[in-house]
A protein has these predicted regions:
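Bacterial N-terminal signal peptides
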Residues: 8-17
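N-terminal targeting/docking segments
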Residues: 3, 20-23
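Core of compact, soluble alpha-helical bundle domains
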Residues: 23-176
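Bacterial N-terminal signal peptides that target proteins for export
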Residues: 1-9
């Protein structure tokens, strides 16, 4: 009887060890809760992006945000697909026949994004993460990943940059 108990304990300890190893290897996609959780945050973020007056001061962004009414739903889908793929989920971000789904470098030059506009988007992203109670570790990784795209997206370096500060759980997050 003791041998069976000891063997069971060893099996449980081994499984617990493998479980903690597996969780240490979870992708950001898995830690965020998968496609539906990402879609929920992206839905909120895109709604905030489309009504932001600072972003809509850029004529190219305003034309997109206030032009074709289907562009918002399409952008939500494309952003979700991109985030899913970039965080280690399924490879679902694909180019389409309309020219969407390209790399960030190919898809943003015509928007003439400034550092300030990039900072506004980062601030809105951070607020979205807080809105949906994304963990601090995941927020750090998401914000670092987003910042890594600045040099690819920002082409208008003449505009003044905007730096915001948000705090959560005593941790200060700076968007720049």
């Amino acid at each position: 009887m003791f041998k069976n108990y000891a063997a069971s304990v060893l099996v449980l300890l081994a499984l617990a060890g493998f479980s903690s190893v597996a969780s240490a290897e979870d992708s950001l996609y898995q830690r965020l809760g998968g496609t539906y959780a990402i879609a929920q945050v992206d839905d909120y973020l895109v709604d905030m992006i489309y009504i932001n007056k600072g972003l809509n001061a850029n004529p190219a962004l305003s034309a997109i945000h206030n032009g074709n009414p289907t562009s918002k739903a399409g952008f939500k889908q494309m952003l979700t697909n991109w985030v899913v793929q970039e965080t280690g989920g399924p490879k679902i971000y694909q180019p389409d026949s309309f020219g969407r789904g390209k790399s960030l470098k190919e898809s943003h030059p015509h928007l003439n994004i400034s550092d300030r506009e990039f900072d506004i988007i980062k601030t809105l992203a951070l607020a979205s993460f807080y809105q949906y109670n994304v963990g601090n570790h995941e927020i750090d990784q998401l914000m670092d990943d987003l910042e890594s795209y600045r040099k690819v997206i920002v082409l208008n370096t003449k505009a003044e940059a905007f730096t915001s500060r948000l705090k959560k759980d005593g941790v200060e997050y700076r968007t720049k």
